[in-house]
Amino acid sequence: MSIFTPTNQIRLTNVAVVRMKRAGKRFEIACYKNKVVGWRSGVEKDLDEVLQTHSVFVNVSKGQVAKKEDLISAFGTDDQTEICKQILTKGEVQVSDKERHTQLEQMFRDIATIVADKCVNPETKRPYTVILIERAMKDIHYSVKTNKSTKQQALEVIKQLKEKMKIERAHMRLRFILPVNEGKKLKEKLKPLIKVIESEDYGQQLEIVCLIDPGCFREIDELIKKETKGKGSLEVLNLKDVEEGDEKFE
């Protein structure tokens, strides 16, 4: 699809339109194809690599630019770059049925790949294959959302799959080195955030090796920094606690 803008008659090609309805009116932006998903997933961070122009339209294909008063009424501002960001993040990508089908298939597989990479069978600590996760996603009738990143959706899928199969996020293995004086007291505060304590060593400092849920990492890191006033340290030994070997659950 090619369009002309009425103000400067610059020809825009390879256009992907993102649309949002707000305050009873339609607003559109012109993006480069294949860049919208990259922006939403966080891979692409340069707005100029995504937007063909920072203008907001009511109809991209006709080159009709939105009126300033309509932008203020709908978005509370006439800052077109900021409005473009809102539409880019939350709007609906206008694509053909064939393009949409291809996009959904790719996102479905990407989500399954993330889940397979992050999760294991909790009983065996063995990872699952992407094919098995895809099959499980179809069994729960998971519907891909194009306005959410694949990472966000992978976390949703994990929650839903837990109700149907033995699956959990692979634990992270950490080492804490804490001042002895604060160590024992801090250990009690850390306990609810720790899955398994593998070893403890009391010497001049308290050293603990443990497994945690990855979702607790930030809270643990902040707690150690706060309680030890920067004297304690945290080291990631393994991002994923997975059994050695090539065997995967099919």
Curated annotation (Swiss-Prot):
UniProt GO MF annotations: microtubule binding; ribosome binding; RNA binding; rRNA binding
Gene Ontology cellular component terms for the protein in this record: cytoplasm; cytosol; nucleolus; nucleoplasm; nucleus; spindle pole
Residues the record lists as N-acetylserine modifications: S2
Main location: cytoplasm
Short name of one Pfam family: SBDS_N
Cellular localisation: Cytoplasm; Nucleus, Nucleolus; Nucleus, Nucleoplasm; Cytoplasm, Cytoskeleton, Spindle
InterPro entries from the UniProt entry: Ribosome_mat_SBDS_CS, Ribosome_mat_SBDS_N_sf, Sdo1/SBDS, Sdo1/SBDS-like, SDO1/SBDS_C, SDO1/SBDS_central, Sdo1/SBDS_central_sf, SDO1/SBDS_N
SUPFAM superfamilies with a match to the protein in the record: FYSH domain, Hypothetical protein AF0491, middle domain
Oligomer status and interactors: Associates with the 60S ribosomal subunit. Interacts with NPM1, RPA1 and PRKDC. May interact with NIP7. Found in a complex consisting of the 60S ribosomal subunit, SBDS and EFL1. Interacts with EFL1. Interacts with CLN3.
Protein name according to UniProt: Ribosome maturation protein SBDS
Originating species: Homo sapiens (Human)
